[in-house]
Amino acid sequence: MSGGDGRGHNTGAHSTSGNINGGPTGIGVSGGASDGSGWSSENNPWGGGSGSGIHWGGGSGRGNGGGNGNSGGGSGTGGNLSAVAAPVAFGFPALSTPGAGGLAVSISASELSAAIAGIIAKLKKVNLKFTPFGVVLSSLIPSEIAKDDPNMMSKIVTSLPADDITESPVSSLPLDKATVNVNVRVVDDVKDERQNISVVSGVPMSVPVVDAKPTERPGVFTASIPGAPVLNISVNDSTPAVQTLSPGVTNNTDKDVRPAGFTQGGNTRDAVIRFPKDSGHNAVYVSVSDVLSPDQVKQRQDEENRRQQEWDATHPVEAAERNYERARAELNQANEDVARNQERQAKAVQVYNSRKSELDAANKTLADAIAEIKQFNRFAHDPMAGGHRMWQMAGLKAQRAQTDVNNKQAAFDAAAKEKSDADAALSAAQERRKQKENKEKDAKDKLDKESKRNKPGKATGKGKPVGDKWLDDAGKDSGAPIPDRIADKLRDKEFKSFDDFRKAVWEEVSKDPELSKNLNPSNKSSVSKGYSPFTPKNQQVGGRKVYELHHDKPISQGGEVYDMDNIRVTTPKRHIDIHRGK
């Protein structure tokens, strides 16, 4: 594992333009119109007769084809759109297909659902380190959504009340305000080769503020979010949109908060849209995400995995802590599952015992009735005998008792099946908990070992003889060894942390004329301050530009933190390849 780059240029925080793993709730919104949906020709500001959908060209009537403003050669204030307006309820990702003039959406500005409000409230309470985090609302099935023509690729549109997510009311912003800080965003991310729509938080974020412009259609506005198709928007303040899933959009029932990925938001454009004051509409937050094809999802997942691996390599302590937190959360969930199944099993046993007692009593009643029949059986063929009536009564009792036994047997069989199922479920839950306990223990052990980097220690080891071009080997094999002359200077010295040790290594390099001979003036200045020198550009990867210290035997596997014979100097490119097993 790496000791890092010595510059602090990799803080461990993910980019705010990256992915999220997660968890979720959220239901997509159907783009269709139907009675009772809150979207029909009677309340549709886009026009289009009953049963006709929405038509933006051809036909008769002012502004709908050859009329003023809305034909292809009009002023453009009405738009030339062939798309059906997608009803969008706050917090519910909706599928929308662009037409010639952009995306048409009808935002239902009713109250935010309790489920979505709960997710936002939950995110505000979370304090995960090193990364943005979020909850998955929905997952996408690209094969059911993606089209061959890139210009007709469907989009996922999600809206939220702007004042619920901004740090200050939008109405208080200056008219020339270009951006606004937000507490959460709705972005796309990838996990397990599935594209998700997630609510993310945890890092400073801001989005553009754009003004909606009125069109010639009453109640219809246009807005341009940078990088997204033009939006043609109507706002419905009274009737809520239908909160049902669009084809290809699946509800994610897992509401867990998880770290967001490095590529979260990679195919999302969002903004706060401010309406004219005289419209009476409050500002809304709108997020527009591309629906990726299966190949695009795979490519992005590969990039996500690559960037995660790079980050883990230079942040082993943080990576171990993240894995431990995940393992601990999984164990907590496993404990809850065991407790729930124990409760189910206890109830099943109680019902089983009760049904068994009832069945035993019914069988006894039947046995008594049969015995009574036998007692009067000698009168069965003598209708005139006084005992014949008693024999008949005993037979009726036996019939009723048999019916009761049958019913009690059915109830007992059902209880026995539930008990068997509950026993099996409890056993499976306990086995899963055992696995999670082992995983949590392994993660804790690894964290404890990796945390040695942050603990004091004494430098050991002899290093190896090197020449003035020793850093040329940093991009080869296992990297360049710690020079023996540096090891002689540092051996037996105490260091507060591995960062202090790293700084001392480069300071000693700066004092050695031969080892620093081939460093350029800028790098000589860096090492004199204890900073790692820059590598050649072809050995740099992303933000990782300086030489790094790598433990040949990982600390998590028992490698010693301050053993200079276990430490190599590597370039970022070579360091990444080492951790990839190359």
From Swiss-Prot:
Segments of skewed composition (Gly residues): 20-35, 46-74
One GO process term, biological-process aspect: defense response to bacterium
Pfam families to which the protein is assigned, alphabetical: Cloacin, Col-Pyo_DNase, E2R135
Enzyme kind, highest EC tier: hydrolase
Entry binding sites for Zn(2+): H550, H575, H579
UniProt EC number: 3.1.-.-
Gene Ontology cellular component annotations, sorted alphabetically: extrachromosomal circular DNA; protein-containing complex
Record keywords, A-Z: Antibiotic, Antimicrobial, Bacteriocin, Endonuclease, Hydrolase, Metal-binding, Nuclease, Plasmid, Zinc
Protein purpose: This plasmid-coded bactericidal protein is an endonuclease active on both single- and double-stranded DNA but with undefined specificity.
Protein name, per record: Colicin-E9
Native species: Escherichia coli
